[in-house]
Amino acid sequence: MTKIVASLCDGMSCGHLALDRLNHTDIEYQAFEIDKYAEAVSRYAYPNAIRHGDARNWTNLIGKDVYLLMGGFPCQPYSVAGKGKADGDERDLSDLIFDALRGLKPKYFLFENVPMKKEQELRITMGISEALGTEEFCEPIMINSADFSAHNRKRLYWTNIPIEEWEDKGIVLKDIVEDGMVDRDKAYCVDANYFKGGSMKMYYEKSRRQLVFDTKGCHQVGEADLKGYDIIKRVYATSGKSPALTTMQGGWRQPKIATDELHWRNLTPLECERLQTVPDYYTSYGLFVEWGWCKPISNSQRYKMLGNGWTINVITHILEGMKDV
C-alpha cells in the first residue's frame, strides 16, 4: 500500500533521501517548497514527487490518509544568532505546522528547528501537543549531528516516532575533506550564510565558518610548546628544511606554524554535502520549470540549501523508529 508522505518546507528533499536509505519505495511524496533552487535540485532527483509550492497549501491534502508529516520550519525567527522574535517574526511558520498537524492527523510526524530560548521551545511544544489533542507534552529531543557526521550541528526534533539510543559513528572532519589539513575533529556548524565565506578572525575569535588549511606541501615534523589551538602548535618542514618558528607578540592569535605562509580555504560544496551526509554532488544540478531543462547550481545556492538542510544520517536514524518501515 502506498504511503503518503507530506514534507512542509521540503528544501532539497532531505526527508526523501532519508526514506531512500530505509528502502522506502512505496511512498507518494508530497513536497511543499518555494525556494526555486532547492526545489530544482529536488525535482532533478525526484521527478515523480507531487509539488504544491508554498507550505500554506497543506490544505490540498485534507481528507487524505497522511502516513508521515515532516518539516524543518524556518529557523531564523528562533536562532540565537538572529533577532529571535519567534512568532513575532513574519517568517515564522510554527502556527502553520500546528494547523497542518491538527488538520491532517498523520500517523507519524517529525519537525525540526534550532536550539532556542526555553520559552520559545515551550510554546512550540505546547502548540504541537494541543494540535495532537493530548495532555502529554511532546517534548523535543536534542541531537547533535556530530554523532552521525563530521559536523557539529545541534538541532531540536519534535516527533512521535520512538528514537532508539545511538552510538557515535566516529566520522571526523579529516575523513571528508578533499585535500588540505584541518585542526579539529568536528566542523563548526555550516549555516545558510556559509557562501559569504570565512576568515581567520571569524574562525578563531567567533568559532564560525569552518576553514581548511593548505600547507603547500609541508609535512609536520613536531609541535611547538605554545598555548592555544593545535593549528598554531605545529612545526612543518618544506624541501627538507625546518624553518625557524616565528615569534610575535599578541597572545594565541599571533604565533604561527613554521611555514613561510599558511594558506586557508573554505569548505567546498562537496565537503558540505559530506558534512550533511548528503550523496556526493547531489546539489550540483537542478531541473528548472521555467527553462524546462537541467542546469548547474551555483556554489552560493548549494551552500545555502545545505546550510538550511538536514543531516541525512540523523533523519534516517529517527525514521527507522517507524514500526512499519
Question: What residue ranges belong to the model's regions?
Answer:
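Extreme N-terminal starter segment of soluble prokaryotic enzymes
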Residues: 1-5
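Conserved SAM-binding strand-loop segment of SAM-dependent methyltransferases
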Residues: 48-54
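Class I SAM-dependent methyltransferase "Motif I" SAM/SAH-binding loop
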Residues: 8-13
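Conserved SAM-binding loop
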Residues: 42
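Class I S-adenosyl-L-methionine
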Residues: 58-68, 73-250, 259-265
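Conserved S-adenosyl-L-methionine
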Residues: 22-27
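Conserved acidic E/D residue at the C-terminus of a beta-strand in Rossmann-like folds
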Residues: 31-36, 112-113
